[in-house]
Amino acid sequence: MYKIGLTGGIGSGKSRVADMLAEWGASVIDADEISHALTAPGGAAMPAIAREFGPQAVAADGALDRAWMRDLVFREPTARGRLEALLHPLIGLHTEQAAAQARGLYLVFVVPLLVESGRWRGRVDRICVVDCDPATQIARVQKRSGLTEPAIRRIMAAQAARATRLEAADDVIVNDGATSPDTLRARARTLHDRWLALAGAASQPGGKAAGTPE
């Protein structure tokens, strides 16, 4: 199946784009949703997280205490790597299981840290970045989450720089503060149609998909 890696900084609108692609028939696998399920009450990652970070990492309902973890990552630079070492193998396993069951027109992996991970380029046929300016990112995240601007900037600082994401992109969907919902939908539809054509070509004899040797 033809594979798209969809990414973008926090607040860029990649989830909105993913919802549109799913509406049009793509199979969408969201790494963030998998991560949240793994760290929800009873999630598969929670026993290992409790062992690694102690009971203070677990909220009263048994989920990951995200506010506590954000603060720890800010104070202790190694904490992010320790958490990712626990989560990433599980996310990878669940991602592969979901991909094996996908039956859509093509497959979309929504991965916030796709560019940063370095391992996705060989797993997808194209990388699409949903792009917007930092001020718009901050405003959107503040509106939906109530996080302070310094907290949002810390999250942004842990992600790839905007220029780095754009350099890695095969396709870009601009979703800045001036982009209306209709305009965003039109931009996403243009790429959806392009990917459908590419998926069709890749499925023909002699066509190529990600991971296929030259």
From Swiss-Prot:
EC number(s) recorded for this UniProt protein: 2.7.1.24
Q: Which InterPro entries match?
A: Depp_CoAkinase, P-loop_NTPase
Q: Which residues form the DPCK domain?
A: 3-202
Q: Where does the record say this protein resides?
A: Cytoplasm
Q: In which pathway does it act?
A: Cofactor biosynthesis; coenzyme A biosynthesis; CoA from (R)-pantothenate: step 5/5
Q: Catalytic activity annotated for this protein? A: 3'-dephospho-CoA + ATP = ADP + CoA + H(+)
Keywords associated with the record: ATP-binding, Coenzyme A biosynthesis, Cytoplasm, Kinase, Nucleotide-binding, Transferase
Molecular-function annotations in GO: ATP binding; dephospho-CoA kinase activity
Main localisation: cytoplasm
Q: Name one Pfam family in it.
A: CoaE
Q: Listed GO cellular component terms?
A: cytoplasm
Q: Does the keyword ATP-binding apply?
A: yes
Name the enzyme group at the top EC level. transferase
One GO biological process term is: coenzyme A biosynthetic process
| Coiled coil ranges | none
Q: Binding positions for ATP?
A: 11-16
What role is this protein assigned? Catalyzes the phosphorylation of the 3'-hydroxyl group of dephosphocoenzyme A to form coenzyme A.
Q: Which family does it belong to?
A: Belongs to the CoaE family.
Q: Which PANTHER family match?
A: BIFUNCTIONAL COENZYME A SYNTHASE-RELATED, DEPHOSPHO-COA KINASE-RELATED
What's this protein's name? Dephospho-CoA kinase
The species is Bordetella pertussis (strain Tohama I / ATCC BAA-589 / NCTC 13251)
